[in-house]
Amino acid sequence: VTPSPATDPGDPASYAARVARHVPGLRDLHVMAGILLAEHVPDQGRVLILGAGGGLELQAFSRAHPGWHFDGVDPSPTMIAQARRLLGSDTANITFHQGYIDDAPEGPFDGAACLLTLHFLRHDERLRTLRAVHRRLSPGAPFIAAHHSFPAGGDGEPDLWLRRNAAWLVAGGMDEAQALAGIETMKERLPVLSPAEDERLLIEAGFHDVQLFYAALTFKGWVARA
């Protein structure tokens, strides 16, 4: 969903528009995620954002909850720079950390979110990452995860969902050949898990009260408690 570290994402407005074209209801996803975090994060709470490059969720969360402090983690210096450009002067309550979950502060955090990121990780690394997030959260703290998650069996259903995703992109104005090429790239590069597998990983990592709150073609989103 996000550009690779070697790719210049462009100016903040065009980057935001490009991501929104690929993720159905992106703005509403950010709003819903903020609402779910706010059910348990206090007014002056500390929130961990994993995969914070680009800054879109940081912008949405910090505007809605100016009292929160955010630690944003991302491996790409290019995408962290993009987040800084997007946020402008609104970074007083945001600390960036270049790296992965092991480079994040130990916490404890009052909440955490990882949007459009976990689908890049294979099963074992995804589980390890989720456990590391869980370890950094206060007991009962909310965690939001949203990413590509759809049936991955051999009965043709994965291709059906990918075709539906491509059809949505074409309906939004993307060239059909480009949309279909994107599907092939996803099939080759993304170690996508099924929703049931994603939920099992959250539970295995120590989370409880796992609830689906967002479903948009190939994308799913959950809220869980540490």
Give residue ranges: language-model regions.
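Class I SAM-dependent methyltransferase SAM/SAH-binding core
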Residues: 48-49, 54-103
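A short glycine-rich, Lys/Arg-flanked "PGG" loop and its adjoining helix->strand segment in the class I
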Residues: 127-139
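Core SAM-dependent methyltransferase catalytic element
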Residues: 208-226
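Class I SAM-dependent methyltransferase Rossmann-like catalytic core
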Residues: 4, 9-27
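Conserved alpha-helix/loop element of class I SAM-dependent methyltransferases that forms part
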Residues: 25-43
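C-terminal alpha-helical "lid/dimerization" subdomain adjacent to the S-adenosyl-L-methionine
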Residues: 148-204
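Conserved beta-strand signature within the Rossmann-like core of class I S-adenosyl-L-methionine
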Residues: 140-148
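A short acidic, Gly/Pro-enriched loop at the edge of an enzyme's catalytic core
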Residues: 104-112
